[in-house]
Structure formats: C-alpha cells, structure tokens
Design a protein with these regions (language model features):
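Short aromatic-glycine-(Arg/Gly/Cys) micro-motifs in beta-strand/loop hairpins
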Residues: 10-20
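Short, charged, surface-exposed hinge/linker loops at domain edges
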Residues: 1-5, 11-13, 38-68
C-alpha cells in the first residue's frame, strides 16, 4: 500500500477540491468531504495506471503574507 499527500481546498461554489502534488493531473471535486475522499482514492488508482509518481517529496503547505 502506498500513501499520497492530498491538498484539499474549498472553491467559491462550495465544492471541495482535492489534488495530489506528486501525481500530475490527479484531482477531483465533490460537495462533501466523504465523497471527495472516495473520489480522490479512485483518481489516484486511475492516475497510477498511466503514470508513475514523481520523485519529489511533498513537504507541506505554508502561508505567505504579501501586500496586495
């Protein structure tokens, strides 16, 4: 079994959006977190069928403040 880091955001329409940094193009969306987690697992399995994960290690997400 392999583990992947998943980034989860909520868009302006209220959908949860998940993406996998180490699998290019691997993302999905859903109205609930439960559905999102099921869908991202399916998306990861499909992505692994056509592409190997990048060797980049996911470190984390950091907030950065700028004057805008």
């Amino acid at each position: 079994m392999k583990e992947f880091s998943v980034i989860i955001e909520k868009d302006e329409d209220g959908y949860f959006v998940a993406s996998v940094p180490t699998l290019r193009g691997c993302h999905t969306q859903a109205k609930s977190l439960d559905t999102l987690m099921k869908r991202i697992k399916e998306a990861i399995e499909l992505c692994l069928e056509v592409e190997k994960p990048t060797s980049n290690e996911f470190i984390g997400v950091q907030k950065v403040a700028v004057n805008a």
